[in-house]
Amino acid sequence: MAAAAASSCGGAGCGPHCSSSASAAAVEDAAAAAAEKVGRLSLSRECGKCGGGAAAVAVAGGLGLCGECFRANLLGKFKLAVTSNAMVRPTDSVLLAFSGGPASRVALQFIHEMRCKAIESWDVSNSQALPVFGVGVAFVDESVLCSKPRDEIEMAIEDIRSIVSSLSTGVKAMHIARLEDVFSTESEDGERRLREAVDMIGDDTGREDFLRCLRMLSLQKIAMENGYAKIMLGSCASAIACHVLSATVKGQGYSLPADVQYVDTRWEIPVVLPLRDCLAQELTLLCELDSLKTQQHLDRPSNGINSLVASFIKRLREENPSREHTIVRTAQKLKPFSFNKFSADGYHDFLPSRLRPKFQKFDSDESTFSEILCLMCGSPFSESELQNLESTKHKAQKKIDLYTAHCCQSCYFQILPAGENLNEHFFSLLPKLWTGKMDTISDSHSLLRDQIEEYLLEENDDGN
């Protein structure tokens, strides 16, 4: 009797139609364990899409999907974002920013699969006219500011390498850049300057935002030095929802539309967000289902406003899982900037004819990017910030005045140290990729002022 029970509930002789209560309980326990591990999930008995009898799971209160349909749904969102927004052209080389977390891990997997599919299509094509886009991976090493033991850090970085190298084909190169490299000069290592600059920022929120700006600067540096045409971020709907609320609290409402679009061309190398419609819970669950290895050992704890907002979003998610999508959709209704789309001549020639008109119908006034951007965070200036900048240009006596005027109000109050002398030293520590632009503007301003003064003196001499 015991043997019969064992063979009918998962033993070696268990048949495909076994209906043992013990077996059902085991399945339910496994599903509950997965739900607890991933977060608040809705469990159902069957898939709402294919109607299969397998256990189904849904995130954010959506329709229950089996594992295959759930994965296909996320991949479909990713592909739709990439193709309908012309994120990647066949001639592009794309740099994927990889942090080791679930979002960037899924982005890496999906873009890898898209490239493999493109290679297959190219192989069977008779003309083989269009090339296949390339993919590189970048990881910004911030361990210089981490208190963890060095051997743990090196082990985590090695895990990052192994995750990328586990992909069979398609990755052009793996770039691991130290955060302090953007501070380095020919005569000085950047670690001291980075530490000193960070220590001068007294506000926890400002310190986090400053590091986020440096992270983007590091990615831009990698992309420019290695010939990449796009930078792909793993920012998902959950992360964007947190950013929407935190930016509102910080007074960055004017520049907010720039950060929530699929495409952002204000940078030297354009940035794209193909996971904008996917929730963090969904991406974490997919990593669990597909056994996609992640590495988050190097994540730094969040403090200040960003931490409070993340906790608030978590509470909202527990009450109503769809709140994150609601926040993002609300922010998307704000009017985007001219740099939130690709509008270069000939850019969309590779697109299918049915999609091309969508991108060619733009106002000629919006085709030229004319926004003034913050020196550090890249936020477009509001009207009041522009007025302050113009006023400072006319009366500025020192270079530091132009530096501070080229910072948005959020960076000015949260990142810059108080006091003119401290500001001068702080700006002297910043990467040349930032201050070099301001030096050029300052020199042009000084030259123009000298020419005006010389002209006025000549007029006075003629009058005498």
Curated annotation (Swiss-Prot):
Keyword tRNA processing: yes
Keyword line: Cytoplasm, tRNA processing
Domain of life: Eukaryota
Protein's GO biological process: protein urmylation; tRNA wobble position uridine thiolation
Keyword Oxidoreductase attributed: no
GO MF terms held by the record: nucleotidyltransferase activity; sulfurtransferase activity; tRNA binding
Pathway: tRNA modification; 5-methoxycarbonylmethyl-2-thiouridine-tRNA biosynthesis
Compartment list: Cytoplasm
UniProt-listed InterPro entries: CTU2, Rossmann-like_a/b/a_fold
GO CC aspect terms: cytosol
Family stated for the protein in its record: Belongs to the CTU2/NCS2 family.
Known role: Plays a central role in 2-thiolation of mcm(5)S(2)U at tRNA wobble positions of tRNA(Lys), tRNA(Glu) and tRNA(Gln). May act by forming a heterodimer with NCS6/CTU1 that ligates sulfur from thiocarboxylated URM1 onto the uridine of tRNAs at wobble position.
Protein name as annotated: Cytoplasmic tRNA 2-thiolation protein 2
Species this chain originates from: Oryza sativa subsp. japonica
